[in-house]
């Protein structure tokens, strides 16, 4: 009901001695009227001042108001000085007067305990307020924060062994049951129950980090802190709380993949390898390099956004390249790749990464200039049909082929292919004429180029070409929120993707710094992987004596050396290396990625190339493995991570 639905009553009330006072005057004093209407007060009868309290006793509020015990006083219809009142309002026994704070009236406990002396309120990773010591080391703050957030929940997915059921789809179990996960893009936010605030294990943030002598990462700044950087002599990582895992293969028909933020020894969980120091100490955080490495302003391989992925990496040159940063730097091992396999199984309930994200695996083209012009432009001319294959936001190079003396090679490993523009973004595609389109590139005006052929000799020239190339780091930063996914599309095969903040599949194989295969005479491959703290080496005898034999890749089911589709993968708990464990059949069954065995050579090491490149299509994926190059093999599509 509205107050205007009620008629006003006379403010006159009868005191105990029979006299009449007007309590409206006593209380209101000179207050403004709430209505323009006026009444003849003599036409209203005076009301009794007696009122019944909750305990049943009776008071006369006319007497109390008139005497000044509540409200105004004096009995004359005026107001009294607040300081003269005998029944002033209080809160927590504190008289309400003057300028008071919540602390003054007891809303904030003055005694917060000696243990909280000097602490301040800060906003945590989840947006909640928490007490922190401004002088406490960042590592301690992170450890305490994560300790308060651990829930003990157990996330498990059952995946079928290929021999019993070829489906790539698994079944979520325990605390994983019923949780919905959908990949996102830069414009579409898929449902992701893992980020609903009830599952802290899956929450991540960006950090700067350094590595100790054994290779273990330590956070130095969190994004949002003064001092956090994305350029210069720093590395950017994705950090989440440390976790425990198991990949139980004991059942004949299925595997159980399990993670939790607490050990759960009854489930046989072990700390994730990235979270364990060489001495066995479990760190409170899990930090992995966020981006594919490029050359930063300090001339060293760094994990930073906006860098051109450094091409032509190999197992051997990575030792030199990363050691330039310090003792504990060797480059990322196979565990960085296994990380995405685990979280794809847990969240996506699938053995096949390409069931969730295709990656930049079907984006290979080289087009000659559709229009030859001596005038320099910042666009490249292509035919209308060719333009349909090019992605705005994708990356290309402009140059010309390399002369072998009698022929032209357009291999991306030739520097000339990148002579005019090297790994630059496509900004837009616009009509040039009725038959052609202009592909505008992210280059300055002084970088404009003409499209006349490059002349090597009177008899040999090379046309100017547009070449698809790896994405620069940070393309997936455009994905909405903290979600997993790709910019633009997760399915068109032309974009990288991220998982738990880490970027993958930018268009090149990733060389594992710590893992390689030994070619056995029977066609099998022994996987060697270095434990944390092990010095990396290119010497066969040293590798065989100091690295761990992490697993065996079976020979093709034909009995002779041959490539095959992967049905199941195996893992090593100490190093985190993953490898083909069983043969499959096609891209839509089992793991659905391809294993390249590397030919019939024997008794030699081969480097571990993971994921695929921009031309292998459905053969690519998180478990794709190429085992065909020597440890010194370097190629334009071989990239690396810190």
Predicted features along the sequence, with ranges:
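Fibrous stalk/shaft segments of extracellular and virion attachment machinery
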Residues: 2-136
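Hydrophobic beta-strand signal
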Residues: 122, 397, 510-511
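Short, surface-exposed secondary-structure boundary micro-motifs
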Residues: 126, 401-402, 515
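C-terminal, surface-exposed recognition/capping segments
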Residues: 142-165, 426, 509-517, 540-642
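Surface-exposed intrinsically disordered loops and tails
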Residues: 222, 353-377, 404-418, 452-493, ...
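Short aromatic-cysteine micro-motif
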Residues: 231-234, 264-401, 415-423, 427-505
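Short catalytic/ligand-binding loop motif for oxyanion handling, primarily in non-cytosolic enzymes
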Residues: 247-249, 296, 338-341, 511, ...
């Amino acid at each position: 009901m509205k107050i205007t639905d009620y008629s006003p009553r006379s403010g006159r009330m009868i005191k105990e001695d029979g006299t009449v006072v007007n309590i409206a005057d006593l209380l209101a004093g000179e207050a403004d009227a709430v209505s323009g209407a006026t009444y003849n007060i003599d036409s209203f009868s005076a009301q009794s001042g007696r009122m019944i309290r909750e305990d049943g006793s009776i008071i006369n509020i006319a007497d109390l108001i008139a005497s000044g015990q509540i409200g105004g006083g004096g009995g004359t219809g005026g107001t009294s000085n607040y300081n003269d009142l005998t029944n002033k309002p209080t809160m927590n026994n504190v008289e309400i007067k003057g300028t008071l704070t919540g602390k003054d009236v007891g809303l904030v406990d003055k005694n917060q305990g000696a243990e909280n002396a000097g602490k301040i309120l800060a906003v945590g990773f989840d947006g909640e307020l928490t007490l922190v010591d401004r002088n406490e080391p960042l590592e301690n703050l992170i450890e305490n924060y994560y300790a308060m957030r651990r829930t003990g929940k157990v996330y498990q997915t059952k995946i079928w062994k290929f021999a019993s059921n070829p489906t790539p789809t698994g079944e979520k179990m325990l605390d994983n049951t019923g949780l919905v996960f959908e990949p996102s893009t830069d414009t579409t936010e898929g449902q992701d129950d893992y980020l609903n605030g009830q599952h802290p294990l899956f929450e991540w943030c960006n950090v700067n980090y350094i590595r100790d002598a054994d290779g273990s990462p330590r956070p130095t700044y969190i994004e949002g802190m003064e001092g956090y950087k994305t350029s210069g002599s720093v590395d950017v990582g994705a950090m989440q709380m440390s976790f425990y895992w198991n990949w139980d293969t004991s059942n004949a028909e299925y595997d159980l993949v399990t993670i939790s933020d607490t050990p759960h020894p009854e489930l046989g969980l072990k700390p994730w390898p990235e979270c364990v120091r060489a001495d066995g100490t479990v760190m409170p955080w899990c930090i992995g390099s966020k981006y594919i490495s490029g050359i930063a302003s300090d001339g060293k391989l760094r994990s930073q956004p906006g860098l051109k992925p450094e091409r032509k990496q190999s197992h051997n040159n990575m030792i030199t390249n990363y050691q330039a940063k310090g003792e504990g730097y060797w480059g990322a091992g196979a565990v960085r790749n296994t990380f995405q396999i685990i979280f794809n199984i847990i969240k996506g309930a699938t053995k096949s990464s390409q069931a969730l994200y295709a990656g930049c695996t079907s984006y290979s083209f080289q087009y000659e200039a559709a229009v030859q012009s001596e005038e320099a432009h910042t666009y490249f001319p292509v035919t209308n049909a060719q333009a349909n294959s090019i992605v705005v936001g994708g990356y290309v190079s402009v140059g010309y082929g390399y002369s072998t003396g009698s022929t032209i090679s357009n291999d991306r490993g030739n520097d000339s292919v990148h002579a005019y523009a090297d790994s630059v973004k496509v900004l837009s595609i616009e009509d040039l004429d009725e038959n052609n389109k202009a592909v505008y590139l992210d280059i300055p005006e002084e970088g404009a180029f003409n499209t006349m052929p490059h002349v090597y000799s009177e008899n040999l020239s090379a046309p100017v070409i547009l070449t698809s190339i790896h994405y620069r780091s940070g393309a997936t930063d455009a994905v909405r929120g903290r979600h997993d996914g790709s910019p633009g599309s997760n399915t068109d095969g032309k974009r990288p993707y991220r998982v738990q903040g880490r970027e993958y599949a930018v268009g090149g194989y990733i060389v594992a710094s710590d893992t390689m295969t030994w070619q056995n005479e029977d066609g099998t491959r022994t996987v060697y992987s270095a434990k944390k703290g092990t010095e990396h080496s290119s010497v066969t005898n040293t590798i065989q004596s100091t690295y761990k034999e992490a697993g065996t890749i079976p020979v093709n089911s034909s009995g002779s050396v041959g490539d095959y589709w992967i049905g199941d993968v195996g893992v090593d708990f100490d190093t985190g290396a993953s490898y083909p464990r069983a043969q499959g059949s096609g891209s839509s069954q089992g793991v659905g990625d391809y294993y390249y065995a590397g030919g019939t050579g024997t008794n030699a090491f081969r480097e571990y190339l993971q994921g695929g490149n921009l031309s292998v299509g459905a053969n690519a994926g998180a478990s794709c493995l190429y085992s065909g190059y020597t440890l010194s093999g370097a190629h334009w599509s071989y990239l690396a991570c810190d």
